Amino acid sequence: MYASRAYPHYLHLAVDFAGSHYSQMTPCENLRSDVEAALAANTELSTCAVQALLIYSIVLFSRDEIEDAHIAFGRCAEIALEIGMNRADFASSRHPENSVEAESLRRTWWELFVADVLMAIPLKTISFRCSAVSPEVPLPCEESLYTGNCELPEPRKVLEFKRRILLEEDVVFSSFSYRIEAATILGRVLVLNRLTDYHRDHLQAIENALVSWSNHLPMEKMEIVDPYGNMDEMMFQAHVIIAHASMLLHLPRSRFYPLLSSPQDDFMPYTHLHSSSASTRLVQSIKAMNASRRLSDYISLCPNIQKHTPFIIPALAMAGLTQLATSKNHSEECFDHHYNRVTLVLGCLKKMKRTWHLAEPAYHRVRSCAARLISDLMDKLNSEPLSKSAVLTQSTPRESEENNSPTGSRTSGCASSASARARPQFH
């Protein structure tokens, strides 16, 4: 394929380097040196250089080589902006007779946009490169169209997507479009968390955006798995990004934060803490808990964790930590619900760390936190009959009823009915 399409060798190497992490036969480190040397020797400013550097930077980030990843990504974004990939007509002018090639370039730009936000999560200072320019590039189409063998339709504009809220009927956009909006909201959360001072309205505006994202989803995009068991990976990632953004926003302002935060903790949200009332912290705790529960629900629907982007690793770690903190503030009746979700997260991280080193510290952080927070309660409940445990883990009537509602609005029986019982325990 590379020879027939005349792709440069450095792009071939970048793809091989990414794929080598899924194979036990290929020496990753040798390929890393090869692709690094090839990219360093390349002097052309081209879309292929952008694509190779984007792949390379994401792989480095997933290997927990954060500093090198940001250096590579910075060069990638610099080239993309210099050649004008952010312009509305860039892709179509490069490939006026080939809609698939033009779509590939639009997707490259928007993947840059999303990666720019996701790679900023562990940083203490943020300097977004791609979201600093006006959103001129048309939106990507649906995955099924892109991978098909037909001519692609005229791409839709970002303004069309934004104006959908003014229409009486739902207008369905591509799953990639909702993922882009999710990343935009996440970027707003990251910026807010790093402000030393802000008005309460700024926080409320982002809370409104998080809720509105779900409320404006058409029915076709509320679920991430269709009736035939096919998964929509773009919508899966979009839902995970929104859940992660919600945890990043609410957890630092909740009563859970003192239980989990520690110096130099890369997995907790970086923010300047502000004083708030006990009732406000309680509400923030419940919102963080619900976001972590939703994320674990998405993972349970799509359990083949190796098929998912390694960008979900920080979200998994935060979901596990939030569930652990919740278990300390809820009654023992709820413990099994939280324990099962923590077990799910640990299993996913354990499996992902075989491929991506970024999951290694995440796994050990959640595991060590679990050993500290719930080990004693596990010992206590282990002495009880198994039949009692089975009764406690049955769904409550509220849970059974709400599990039939759309994924985005489900609330577990523990998270709803038990939250009221647990409120006095938030002292």
Predicted regions and their residues:
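Charge-rich, intrinsically disordered regulatory segments
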Residues: 1-9, 106, 116, 126-127, ...
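Acidic, Ser/Thr-rich, low-complexity intrinsically disordered regions in fungal proteins
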Residues: 1-173, 194-201, 208-231, 250-275, ...
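C-terminal hydrophobic structural anchor segments
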Residues: 282-332, 339
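Amphipathic alpha-helix face/heptad-repeat signature
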Residues: 108, 178, 206, 236-243, ...
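Residue register of alpha-helical TPR repeats
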Residues: 14, 51, 111, 181, ...
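Solvent-exposed, amphipathic alpha-helical segments
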Residues: 178-192, 323-326
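Hydrophobic, well-ordered secondary-structure elements that form the walls
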Residues: 247, 320, 349
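C-terminal, low-complexity intrinsically disordered regions in eukaryotic proteins
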Residues: 258, 263, 268-283, 287, ...
